[in-house]
Amino acid sequence: IYLNNEIMMKKDDEFQLHKDKEAVYSYFVDYVNKNTVFFHNLKEKMDYLIENDYYINFYDMYTHEQIKEVFRLVYSKKFRFASFMSASKFYQSYALKDDSEGRFLERYEDRIAIVSLYLAQGNVDKAKEYAQMLINQEYQPATPTFLNSGKKRSGELVSCFLDEMGDN
């Protein structure tokens, strides 16, 4: 946070925008990486998250190889958060955390892959299409959809409901 705040401290009459990149790096090294549950591979991760009721059973819709294809596509983009605030917001509000210690079970790329797989409902080509749009930041679903898709213990996927009401 200190590095992020230094952005507004002018040096030679210019904002220190590079401090934001330093803040993102520091946030990952000092906080995110230390508080993320480590899995040896995707199969171990998916099995754990499904068996412990964090995710719905994606194996009912996809083979492990299909799931792996979507994750591989997303991770191949080598996504990096553009700012400290975006990274902080994702990990504070959207990343899946474990029940006991609040450790992270997902990275941003994992959330993208899971949302894509969920929305495609078994159509791996659609899942890859969605994943491509999301990781390239061409489209961002509404908060409830991005937050809850694919989670076993989730809320609604929409942020509002339209009801028809009579005039009496």
Give residue spans per PLM region:
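Extended catalytic cores of very large enzyme megasubunits
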Residues: 1-168
